[in-house]
């Protein structure tokens, strides 16, 4: 039911995690959101940054976030030349995020750094002339804002070959199967999928087809 309402939005794992988390909250937290980072991160789909956002924006407590927008602001402001996707860089950014939290109105700071990253300190063509942080931004003052963040070279994406079986009856209905396995489109419906042609052939032999010889490879 959740996925049917979620249809078309993408990120279907988020829909499943919402339902899982709701059940945990009802069972273990009296249907209330916990107010500790540890308990929040125990919920499916919630990591350290999301937990920090919930604590800061929802409970107005002092907690750091480090989403993509906040990362970009911090690496440019402090001119961190190491690749942003390194574990060591992430650890450094978490320390910086914690050290620079204000003692009061942390919720306003959290919303502000996300907005600056999303609207001003953008991935390309940052609007430094509009940025309230540009005066002390090391990257801007050294004219390196377009060179940072540094990223590791992208790995070549693997090519995966699969076979889909498309079966249609006289009424125009097609055969679909639920994808229970982990991976792409988990829990959704698709044509029967096979990694090898032999698997497809074996599968079709078990089906009560009126004309099995009509199956063609395309």
Question: Where are these predicted regions, by residue range?
Answer:
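Catalytic cores of DNA base-excision repair glycosylases
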Residues: 1-127, 133-142, 209-212
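Intrinsically disordered, low-complexity, charged terminal extensions of DNA damage-control enzymes
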Residues: 118-218
